[in-house]
Amino acid sequence: MTKKAESKELPPFEYPEGYQLFAGVDEVGRGPLVGAVVTAAVILDPNNPIEGLTDSKKLTDKKRELLFPEIQEKALAWSLGRCEAHEIDELNILQATMVAMQRAIAGLNITPDFALIDGNKVPELPMAGLAVVKGDLRVQEISAASIIAKVTRDREMEELDKAYPQYGFAKHKGYPTKAHFEAIEEHGVISEHRRSFKPVKRVLGIE
């Protein structure tokens, strides 16, 4: 079965009954060797719909940049959460992602009744929550969160690229590409690199 066929067969999402305010939560940046893992939480306004919401990875940069301010303007509430590279090294990437999600939800200026989390794990939260596999494709609130998180982190990588142009962060966004491997082999690591990740440990000689 192809990936495309799988996506067509995703079951429609049924929102849990008895709740009014749903926050969608997603993360960007679990895989990169550098920078924070960034999360977003979004509560959409059912009376102010946003066209074109889907998984941020399926959108062009231009479309994400167009949707980003529209989500910020039309959502009832949105918030960012993050865990920096040093926190990822202390906690591990899974736990750091959970903490970043908790921070995003805590930052909302409206408290949701229910949190819908992309993936298969729910962090400890003060409200009910549900993990939704492929949630960024199935749940609009999660789609919106994925766009907010993706645009935010990509912009951070573009800023980091200005400070360290030799690494090519604007292009690969910190992910473990051949160009990134070659750059850290040649130039070493910077403070934003995740020292617990194997390719970085190898360059540091601590593997």
UniProtKB/Swiss-Prot annotation:
Keywords attached to this entry: Cytoplasm, Endonuclease, Hydrolase, Manganese, Metal-binding, Nuclease
Localization of this protein: Cytoplasm
EC number: 3.1.26.4
Listed InterPro entries: RNase_HII, RNase_HII/HIII, RNase_HII/HIII_dom, RNaseH-like_sf, RNaseH_sf
GO molecular function: manganese ion binding; RNA binding; RNA-DNA hybrid ribonuclease activity
Known catalytic reactions: Endonucleolytic cleavage to 5'-phosphomonoester
Residue ranges of every copy of the RNase H type-2 domain listed in the record: 20-207
The keyword Cytoplasm belongs to this UniProt entry's keyword annotation: yes
Alphabetized PROSITE patterns for the sequence: RNASE_H_2
Family: Belongs to the RNase HII family.
Function: Endonuclease that specifically degrades the RNA of RNA-DNA hybrids.
Name of this protein: Ribonuclease HII
Organism per entry: Aliivibrio fischeri (strain ATCC 700601 / ES114)
Gene: rnhB
